[in-house]
Every structure is written in structure tokens, then in C-alpha cells.
Amino acid sequence: MADPARARKLADRIKVIVAERLDRGLRDPRLGFVTITDVQVTGDLQHATVFYTVYGTDQERADTAAALTAATGMLRSEVGKNITARLTPTLQFQLDAIPENAAHIEDLLRQARDHDTEVAGLAEGAAYAGEQDPYVKPREAN
């Protein structure tokens, strides 16, 4: 089991290497606008999961996933050339759901804001039922 700090450094290095290689371009027309968001490496440094997002439609996401799967070997050899680890970790690409989750959270926050505005509007014109405040009674001095 490797030191967690070493695993994190290796993950950061893999993220940079893969992102730079994708920035230089692959010869695959299916590859869309890809952003590498994170890399997680197992404790034994044997496997790396590369999380990515794709800007575009569902079809472009599927095409990009196929292109990354096809280019896994080439990207792994690129990683192997640029790291100092004894063994090169296997790469697995996983679509990151951050944009979809963020949009869902933004929608929920908008709904909550709208509901708060509606409640505040109803509270402005509201009055207590009965007296001003039926629970507050003046104290009598003995």
C-alpha cells in the first residue's frame, strides 16, 4: 500500500499528462470537447480512474467515450513515459456527472428561492389570529 500523499501526487501527474495529451489532440474525429476533472489512483498504484466531462449532446458524450476507450493504450503509454513509478497504472475513463448534478442543485435552489419569495409575500399582509400576540401577557406586580 502506497503512501496516500504519493498516490495523490501520482494522480495529479496523470491528470496533467492526460490533459496535455488530449490538448495536443488525438487523431480521432469522435473526440469532443473534453475536460479532465479528476484522477483517482488505487492504494497500490496499479489502477487509475480518470474522470472527465464533455461539453455537448448525449451523442457527443457517447462518441467521446468510445474515442477515449480506443485511445486508452496510447494514453497509458504516454503516462508511462512521463512518470517515475515502476509500473504504469491501467487507465479507466469515467464520465463525471458534475455538470448534471450542478444543474439539478441550481434548479432546487431556484425552487426554494421562489417558494421563500411566495411565503414572504403572504407574510407581509398577514395578521395574527386573535390578539396582537396572544401568548404575551403583561406581568402583574405583587
UniProtKB/Swiss-Prot annotation:
Q: Which GO MF terms does the UniProt record name? A: ribosomal small subunit binding
Keywords attached to this Swiss-Prot or TrEMBL record, sorted alphabetically, are: Cytoplasm, Ribosome biogenesis
Q: Provide the leader sequence positions.
A: none
Gene Ontology, cellular component aspect: cytosol
Q: Where in the cell is it found?
A: Cytoplasm
Question: What GO terms describe the biological role, i.e. biological process, of this protein?
Answer: maturation of SSU-rRNA
> Which cysteine-cysteine pairs are annotated as disulfide bonds in the entry?
none
Q: What does this protein's UniProt record list under function?
A: One of several proteins that assist in the late maturation steps of the functional core of the 30S ribosomal subunit. Associates with free 30S ribosomal subunits (but not with 30S subunits that are part of 70S ribosomes or polysomes). Required for efficient processing of 16S rRNA. May interact with the 5'-terminal helix region of 16S rRNA.
HAMAP family named in the record:
RbfA (MF_00003)
User: What family, per the record?
Assistant: Belongs to the RbfA family.
The UniProt entry, under NCBIfam families, shows:
rbfA
Its assembly, as annotated, is: Monomer. Binds 30S ribosomal subunits, but not 50S ribosomal subunits or 70S ribosomes.
**Protein name (Swiss-Prot/TrEMBL):** Ribosome-binding factor A
Q: Coding gene?
A: rbfA
